[in-house]
Regions:
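Secondary-structure boundary/capping motif
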Residues: 16, 54-58, 119, 145, ...
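DNA-binding alpha-helical recognition surfaces that contact promoter or target DNA
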Residues: 56, 153, 199
Length: 231
């Protein structure tokens, strides 16, 4: 048939991608908690979609390590893994610091204004999930300007794990432990100092790992003491 003359109404996203985004947000925010079992039927009822696009989204999330598909045992939200969190943070620190070093010289006036705006916002934000999302947006200004597709893919796979851990343990990533690094990053970007900006990014992720792991160790020690006292 001839090509129609009237504009076609194309969906902005495929249904499976919409479902993926909804599930990803629910996992990262903690609405779907670590270890929680989920079934296709539950998801069909909640999302109002058929099994095929739901299963495609679930398999994609399983490939990212956010969902576990257990043979003969069903599907569940992946447990929190402090070791993986530390590894993801360490990798992001290395990759981002290298990208930021190259990106600083490429920043536009609009980029620098956006960095300053996000820095001001994160400085007065204490809620864990919101703060993590603002920091991600701030880092993304540099990453987007650098335009390296491999780094973009690393970000898409790693940031959800990091944000999820931070959200699940409010206070674990103490804002005071990372604020100095973010202050230094904003100042370096404004001054066009690539080396200082890269160092600030590395310092942010190093401080973040130390903060969360220290909190995790303290909680583990407290649980051990409680168990010993109960024995």
């Amino acid at each position: 048939m001839p090509v129609p003359q009237t504009p076609a109404r194309m969906p902005r996203k495929l249904l499976r991608d919409q479902i993926f985004d909804t599930l990803l947000d629910a996992i990262v925010s903690g609405d779907l908690v670590a270890g929680e079992p989920i079934s296709d039927k539950q998801l069909e009822t909640w999302l109002g979609a058929s099994r095929t696009p739901i299963r495609e989204a679930v398999n994609r999330l399983a490939g990212m390590g956010l969902i576990e598909v257990l043979p003969q045992r069903g599907t569940r939200i992946a447990p929190l893994d402090p070791i993986r969190f530390a590894e993801e943070m360490e990798m992001l620190g290395v990759v981002y610091s290298a990208a930021v070093r190259e990106a600083v010289a490429l920043l536009t006036d609009a980029d620098r204004a956006r960095i300053a705006e996000l820095h001001a916002t994160v400085s007065r934000t204490r809620e864990a999930l919101e703060r993590a999302r603002i920091v991600d947006a701030l880092m993304s200004v540099f990453i987007d300007r650098y335009r390296n597709t491999l780094i973009q893919r690393i970000r898409e796979r790693s940031v959800p794990h990091v944000t999820r851990m931070i959200t699940a343990r409010p206070g674990a990533l103490d804002a005071t432990d990372t604020s100095a690094a973010l202050d230094a990053l904003a100042s370096a970007a404004a001054a066009g100092d690539a080396d200082a900006a890269a160092h600030a990014v590395s310092a942010y992720f190093t401080a973040g790992v130390a903060s969360v792991m220290a909190r995790d160790a303290a909680e583990t020690a407290a649980m051990t003491v409680t168990e010993d006292e109960s024995a």
